[in-house]
């Protein structure tokens, strides 16, 4: 790769990712209200929405689990730009559907389109963008570059959420569809291929008719099965070759498992307990996105050379856990806003893990390695709804098993709940104080 194309390629990549993420994120604050209005109008609680959301996450996760390594591996052979075209184009379809109408029937059409397009789109654009950056940046600068890429996505998140805060729901989906189209056109016109033409093994689009496209090794209908088996073997081989890669995969799985459960349940929890709506969701996301942007664009390039990726990974995981804990014990509507500020540090893990992974493989395996980590995150997204969707519905229902003060999803706290909770904690403190003489006498 010639150095003269490096900066230009990354600049166009950053613009492409900004436009794409803007189109994806602008609809996030309104989807809860749209889903509830289409399926359970006039209600703040809806089991159908929770289970449909979980089902969509499971289907998307299972599909992405198989697709991500395949997309990454194909991009190693046929180029990042070529593979980016498919998910970015498919992303337009569900957004255009909701821009047309948001009735119950259209919502189900959107649901089906979104579920099956997300199998290819969910995570693949970021996976290919990370591989693109790895093609153009030296190992020593990859963590900072990945952080900048994540910061660009966070900036898009903030800008999109600000727009959603002031736009109507209908206009929001129209803007999203327009930006999705614009991002695809910009990518095709301006983004240069990061892999030199002489290193690409084959072109996906060819003038000659291929008997078995992209699957030259195994003839006949056994090709698809054989390729899936081969991808699994390649994943296992990469894991065995590198202990750090295996460790990052495990950390990625468990952190994604927690994050997926939090994102799947927190919006319904906040809506049921504090009656959050589109505007409050947008405010919360703006705080989270702004903190993430500042962290990735300003703190990450400074902290990586001083602390290295491993320490930053530990710091990020600690603050991510603290954010989840603070949110789950929220006793007032302002607590989620304070928890969102933790994104200053909780956003570190993804960039750090991707950087560590990129250093464990050769340049011709970057797409495959990033695809493996993305597929492991997808596996966590499959497992998470199986546990969190029933639990969320159970604790949001009238038959919740218990109502532990401040540590419950129960939407109908008793009257004067804040006073009751304060008295509860005061009683705990007093009990501990009274126990001190007894503990000293018996055990010290």
Question: Residue locations for each model-derived region?
Answer:
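Juxtamembrane intracellular "pre-TM" segments in multi-pass secondary transporters
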Residues: 1-10, 193-251, 272-273
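Hydrophobic core of transmembrane alpha-helices in multi-pass small-molecule transporters
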Residues: 18, 94, 105-124, 334-350
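Short amphipathic helix-loop junctions that connect adjacent transmembrane helices
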Residues: 30-50, 264-281
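Helix-to-loop junctions at the C-terminal end of transmembrane segments
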Residues: 66-80, 295-309, 392
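C-terminal ends and interior cores of transmembrane alpha-helices
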Residues: 85, 89-105, 318-331
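Cytoplasmic helix-loop-helix junction between adjacent transmembrane helices
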Residues: 112-153
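Glycine-rich segments within core transmembrane alpha-helices of 12-TM secondary carriers
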Residues: 141-165, 180, 376-387
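A membrane-interface helix-boundary motif in multi-pass transporters
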Residues: 166-180, 390-416
């Amino acid at each position: 790769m010639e150095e003269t194309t490096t900066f230009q390629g990354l600049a166009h990549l950053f613009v492409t990712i900004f436009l794409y993420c803007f189109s994806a994120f602008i609809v996030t604050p309104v989807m809860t209200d749209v889903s509830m209005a289409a399926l359970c109008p006039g209600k703040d609680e809806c089991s159908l929405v929770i289970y449909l959301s979980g089902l969509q996450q499971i289907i998307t996760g299972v599909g992405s689990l198989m697709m991500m390594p395949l997309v990454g591996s194909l991009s190693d052979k046929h180029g990042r730009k070529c593979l980016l075209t498919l998910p970015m184009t498919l992303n337009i379809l569900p957004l255009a559907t909701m821009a047309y109408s948001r009735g119950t029937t259209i919502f189900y059409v959107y649901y089906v389109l979104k579920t099956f397009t997300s199998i290819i789109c969910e995570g693949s654009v970021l996976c290919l963008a990370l591989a693109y950056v790895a093609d153009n940046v030296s190992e020593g600068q990859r963590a900072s570059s990945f952080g900048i890429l994540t910061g660009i996505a966070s900036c898009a998140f903030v800008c999109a959420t600000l727009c959603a805060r002031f736009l109507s729901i209908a206009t929001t989906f129209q803007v999203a569809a327009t930006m999705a189209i614009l991002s695809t056109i910009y990518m095709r016109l301006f983004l240069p291929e990061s892999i030199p033409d002489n290193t690409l093994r084959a072109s996906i689009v060819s003038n000659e008719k291929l008997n078995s496209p992209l699957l030259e090794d195994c003839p006949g209908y056994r090709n698809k099965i054989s390729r899936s088996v081969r991808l699994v073997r390649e994943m296992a081989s990469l894991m065995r070759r590198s202990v750090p890669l295996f460790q990052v995969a495990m950390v990625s799985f468990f952190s994604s498992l927690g994050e997926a459960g939090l994102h799947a349940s927190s919006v319904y929890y906040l809506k049921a307990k504090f009656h959050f709506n589109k505007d409050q969701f947008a405010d919360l996301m703006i705080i989270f996105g702004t903190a993430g942007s500042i962290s990735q664009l300003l703190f990450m390039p400074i902290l990586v050379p001083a602390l290295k990726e491993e320490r930053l990974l530990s710091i990020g995981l600690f603050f991510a856990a603290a954010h989840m804990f603070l949110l789950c014990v929220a006793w007032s509507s302002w607590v989620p806003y304070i928890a969102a500020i933790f994104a200053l540090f909780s956003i570190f893990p993804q960039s750090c893990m991707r950087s560590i992974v990129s250093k464990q493989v050769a340049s011709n395996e970057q797409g495959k390695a990033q695809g493996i980590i993305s597929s492991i995150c997808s596996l966590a997204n499959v497992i998470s709804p199986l546990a969190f969707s029933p639990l969320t519905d159970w604790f949001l229902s009238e038959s919740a098993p218990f109502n532990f003060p401040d540590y419950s999803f129960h939407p109908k706290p008793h009257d004067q709940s804040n006073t009751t909770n304060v008295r509860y904690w005061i009683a705990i403190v007093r009990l501990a104080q009274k126990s001190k003489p007894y503990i000293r006498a018996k055990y010290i």
